[in-house]
Amino acid sequence: MQLSWKDIPTVPTSNDMLDIVLNRTQRKTPTVIRAGFKITRIRAFYMRKVKFTCEGFIEKFDDILKGFPNINDVHPFHRDLMDTLYEKNHYKVSLASVSRAKTLVEQVARDYVRLLKFGQSLFQCKQLKRAALGRMATIMKKLKDPLVYLEQVRQHLGRLPSIDPNTRTLLICGYPNVGKSSFLRCITKADVEVQPYAFTTKSLYVGHFDYKYLRFQAIDTPGILDRPTEEMNNIEMQSIYAIAHLRSTVLYFMDLSEQCGFTIEAQVKLFHSIKPLFANKSVMVVINKTDIIRPEDLDEERQEMLKSIMDFPGVEIMTTSCINEENVMAVRNKACEKLLASRIENKLKSQTRITNVLNKIHVAHPQKRDDGVERTPYIPEAFKNVKKYDPEDPERRPLARDIEAENGGAGVFNINLKDSYLLENDEWKNDVMPEILNGRNVYDFLDPDIAAKLQALEEEEERLEAEGFYESDDDAIEGMDDEDVEDIREKAAWIRDKQKKMINAARSRKALKNRGTMPRSKMAKSFEDMEKHMSSLGHNMSALQSKQSAAAAKNRYTESGADIVYGNNESAKTAGKLRQSDRLMDGVADASMRSKADRMAKLHRRERNRQARQGEADRHATASLPKHLFSGKRGIGSNDRR
């Protein structure tokens, strides 16, 4: 059972909650959309905005509804106390307003998401989103007063003392300024304000102390005036509800010196007025401020008034003084003893608990028969004649430890547990347990004639081999003609060749899967390959052969004097055919210069990378003031920064 509500989350105002949810939507959802995008993408963009905003509002509303206690589920004391402090109907209406707003926000989001599914353009979807968020904001602004009220209730609930209605409790009550708070400060460490004027205590204060290793709580209640309940204010009603609902020992304080501002007659009259609230409670009347006046110093009329209090059953009068702490601990201890005794008495009165205990300790006794014959215990004669065990007797009955000692003692002798088996035949005791396979006993499937069956199978195999049942296909081929055999072998060779070609083609396709295909113009083709291919197609290659021979004779190299003068040697002609050198290493003398060049290139790329440029030609200038964050009026009056 919850006793304190200090962990309720803060309830923001309507404007603050609106800012929180809309800022969260702006931060956690995409912000860029173009009219050229697909219409499905535009719809999804704005539907996400509406759904995300709805989820933000619902999350905030759920925190409020789950944080505050349900006034119908708490203890009656806390329920009446909250009704007195916060007005129960107002509290329920405020929470109901929040719950209704949650339902309305969900309905708005559902309706506008349905409309956004059929949006025809970016402008139309944007206006629908704007209308949805606007309606949610309107619903939120209508919660201005309930949210302010709930925040005040939350703050006050967090300051309420933690009062356990079911623990051991001493309840201090009486007129104002009779010494209730002073007594609480004397018996506990509670820091209660004490002043010489009335109504210093305006709420319930709780202090704790230990008595006989048990934890007690003492509650200081505000002062009560003798008037009808309908005329009492909220301060007095807190005391009334505490007396009515808490199982405790009530300490009714009185001031005989009348320095509190109320006469003895008024204090006695107040006791009789609230006496119906003391039902099923132990009550003590504590006369305080005995350092000023004692009961013996009163006149007979006032003493008779005090004696009238004793007419209430179980009431005991004690005296004390909180100034010099006279008899303070005695009053506390006496109240604790009365409380413990009453709690034990209430437990014993509970019939259910007593019945459960009696059922546990019930002992059954046999009843005598109708004939009245005395039936004594029967002991068999064989048991009476059993010879007592004597370790020194050589003819004694051997025990298990005697057998163990004869066979080497503990750690050497291994007892056979199967000797204790109770079977029809003692020869079965040491039988080997059969194996179980798939839930069946393997021994049940063993055939005693298995050897004879095996011999029969072997004879049948020999007969089949003699009849040629297992002859191979090679023997059948030997009986065929040579032409048929040759035809079969050619077909088999063709099939094998076809399979190899298919495998090679598949490997080629797999090898070229992630590589560039060499263009046909770059592939080297010799004249002999072309001649062989054209001949296979049936073309006459004699004309091409003569042209090839003439071209080869013309290009045959002969060195002349001009070639020597102008340097047209073999190396100059074949320079273009040589393998080109690595351009990355051209102009670099050694590895140290290569490393230095790499460092300088990396240094020059640093600034470009810092500016997030794609390359040296990237000159794109991004917007320094994003329009969606800085558009709108910024006047002196109301402004909209969205």
From Swiss-Prot:
Residues 168-340 form the OBG-type G domain. GO terms for cellular component: cytoplasm; nucleolus; preribosome, large subunit precursor. Keywords: GTP-binding, Nucleotide-binding, Nucleus, Ribosome biogenesis. GO terms for biological process: assembly of large subunit precursor of preribosome; ribosomal large subunit biogenesis; ribosomal subunit export from nucleus; rRNA processing. PROSITE patterns: G_OBG. InterPro entries: G_OBG (IPR031167), GTP-bd (IPR006073), NOG1 (IPR024926), NOG1_N (IPR041623), NOG1_Rossman_fold_dom (IPR010674), NOG_C (IPR012973), P-loop_NTPase (IPR027417). Residues 609-621 have a biased composition (Basic and acidic residues). Pfam families: NOG1, NOG1_N, NOGCT. Belongs to the TRAFAC class OBG-HflX-like GTPase superfamily. OBG GTPase family. NOG subfamily. This is Nucleolar GTP-binding protein 1. It comes from Eremothecium gossypii (strain ATCC 10895 / CBS 109.51 / FGSC 9923 / NRRL Y-1056) (Yeast).
